Amino acid sequence: AQISDTHIRADDDRLSARQLERALAEAHEYRADVILLTGDLVNEERADEYEVLARTIADVSRPLYLMPGNHDDRARIREAFPRHGYLQHLGFLSFAIEDFPVRLVAIDQIVPGETHGLITQAGAEWLDRTLAAVPEKPTIVALHHPPFRTHDMLFDDIGLLDAELFASVIARHRQVERVICGHHHRVAVGQVAHAPVIIAPSTSWVYGLAMYPGQKIAPKTAEQPGWMLHVRAETGGF
């Protein structure tokens, strides 16, 4: 189960927390093997927002993992989730989870103080080494910013820099069956090298689309928030 862009706030009468609780309950009902939150965990990087998030996920019985988005602060994530050992290292919050039939590799490409993402040379080398270490196991790669242009100018302008570098790494590793991300607040699909890319919706709100210059967009629409369930068939493939 992929839950993204939860934008937890401490001052919204628990609306954002309740929306996350609803998504978590549905993921549990569908017996998700694992739950991954793909960034923008909170809205303003505040410690009290991470406290609300920690309380909201405290009783989740399924394995649950967190990764940062451009609204997040790495140090505060570490402080709020000390029992999440995969987060307790210096530098980027990138990690690989080996405990399931599908390997999960999450790459942190956040630039502090900026809304865009960036694949650094060091990040690309880490991803390349991590994927090369287990070449035969089906793998999902997760990041926050979409690694392709969606043609929604609102988000393409604050998208992933050096997406070509990311694509060049993915192209070398055929076991990557899917790339998943968030940031866009709505479902969209694309492709990087051989791998389909799926953008999950947000549990918080949905922005209007900006498809041409000068277009007036709704900052928030009446569309329902959501989350994404990725299902792999027993015969292989998603």
Region annotations inferred by a language model:
Residues 18, 86-90, 160:
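Short gly/ser/thr-rich secondary-structure transition/capping motifs
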Residues 5, 39-40, 69, 144, ...:
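Active-site glycine-centered loops adjacent to acidic/histidine catalytic or metal-binding residues
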Residues 8-12, 75, 113-116, 149-153:
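A short acidic, helix-capping loop that chelates divalent metal ions and anchors anionic groups
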Residues 45, 74-76, 148-151, 187-190, ...:
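Short catalytic/ligand-binding loop motif for oxyanion handling, primarily in non-cytosolic enzymes
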Residues 1-52, 56, 150:
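N-terminal active-site segment of His-dependent metallophosphoesterases
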Residues 47-133, 138, 165-175, 193, ...:
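Extended active-site neighborhood of metal-dependent phosphoesterases/phosphodiesterases
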Residues 24-34, 116-198, 227-229, 238:
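His/acidic metal-ligating clusters that form di-metal
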